[in-house]
C-alpha cells in the first residue's frame, strides 16, 4: 500500500507575482495536481514561473464532487497543492471545508506560508496590531446589524474585506454602529495602483463618495481608544 499523499496549503501572491516563496514554487512544481479556486487565474501564475503541473478546479459549488476525488488521490500516495485566487487558502475561502475533510480522512495537511491580504494591510496600517479580529466579508443578509453590534464592543482592530460595489454601504454601517473611529482602507495591495487611505470613518466615506471605488478593499477599524488616532 502506498504512503498517503500530503495536501499542501499553498499561499500565492495577492497581486505582485514576485510575492511567492521558493518553497511554494517547489511544491507547486513537484505536486501531482493543483486544486485551484479558478484555474484560469492560477494558470497565469503557473505560466509566469513555467510550472506545468495539471490543475483541477475546487470551489464552493463543486466541493461535494471534488472532495472525494481529492481524498482518493491522496490515498493513492500522490501529493496535491491547493491554492486560492490570491493569498492563503482557507482564509475567508472555501478551502477550509476541503482541509477539514482531508483531516477527517486521516491524510496529512501541511501549510506553505506566504501572502495574506489581511496581514499585509494591517502591518502597514499604523493601527494597533497587538489584538485584531479578522471578520472577512460582512454578510449582506439577515444578521448583518447584529454582527456589527457585537463587533463594536470588541477592544481590537477589526479587519473586513469588501467589494467596490458595497464599500460605501459598509462604511455607512460602520459609522452608524462603531462611531467615527480611526480607520484605514488598503486598496489594490501590491499592485500598480496600491493605495492606503487613513483617517476617520467619515473621512474614508467622503473619499469614496467623491471617487469611484475600484479594486479590492481591506477595511481596518481602530478600537475605541483616545490613544488610537489619525
Feature locations, PLM:
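Glycine-rich, flexible N-terminal cofactor/catalytic loop recognition
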Residues: 1-61
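A contiguous loop/helix-start segment that scaffolds small-molecule binding in enzyme catalytic cores
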Residues: 4, 157, 161-230
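Loop/turn-to-beta-strand initiation segments
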Residues: 6-7, 77-81, 157
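Short glycine-rich anion-binding loops that position phosphate/pyrophosphate groups of nucleotides
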Residues: 14-16, 85-89, 164-166, 224-226
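Short active-site oxyanion
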Residues: 28-34, 106-109, 157-158
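Conserved helicase motor
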Residues: 57-64, 137-141
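Glycine/small-residue-rich loop that forms an oxyanion/phosphate-binding "nest" at active or ligand-binding sites
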Residues: 59, 67-116
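Class I SAM-dependent methyltransferase SAM-binding "motif I" and its flanking Rossmann-like core
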Residues: 97-154
Amino acid at each position: 500500500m502506498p504512503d498517503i499523499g500530503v495536501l499542501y496549503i499553498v499561499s500565492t501572491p495577492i497581486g505582485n507575482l514576485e510575492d511567492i516563496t521558493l518553497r511554494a514554487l517547489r511544491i507547486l512544481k513537484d505536486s501531482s495536481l493543483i486544486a485551484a479556486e479558478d484555474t484560469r487565474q492560477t494558470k497565469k501564475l503557473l505560466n509566469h514561473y513555467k510550472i506545468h503541473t495539471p490543475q483541477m478546479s475546487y470551489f464552493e459549488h463543486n466541493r461535494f464532487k471534488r472532495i472525494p476525488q481529492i481524498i482518493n488521490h491522496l490515498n493513492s500516495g500522490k501529493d496535491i497543492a491547493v491554492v486560492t485566487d490570491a493569498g492563503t487558502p482557507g482564509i475567508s475561502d472555501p478551502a477550509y471545508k476541503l482541509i477539514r475533510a482531508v483531516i477527517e480522512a486521516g491524510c496529512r495537511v501541511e501549510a506553505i506560508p506566504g501572502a495574506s491580504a489581511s496581514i499585509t494591510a494591517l502591518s502597514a496600517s499604523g493601527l494597533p496590531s497587538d489584538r485584531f479580529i479578522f471578520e472577512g466579508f460582512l454578510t449582506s443578509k439577515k444578521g448583518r446589524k447584529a454582527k456589527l453590534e457585537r463587533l463594536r464592543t470588541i477592544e481590537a482592530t477589526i479587519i473586513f474585506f469588501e467589494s467596490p460595489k458595497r464599500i460605501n454601504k459598509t462604511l455607512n454601517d460602520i459609522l452608524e454602529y462603531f462611531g467615527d473611529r480611526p480607520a484605514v482602507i488598503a486598496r489594490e495591495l501590491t499592485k500598480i495602483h496600491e493605495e492606503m487611505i487613513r483617517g476617520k470613518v467619515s473621512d474614508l466615506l467622503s473619499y469614496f463618495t467623491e471617487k469611484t471605488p475600484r479594486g479590492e478593499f481591506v477595511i481596518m477599524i481602530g478600537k475605541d481608544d483616545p490613544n488610537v488616532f489619525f
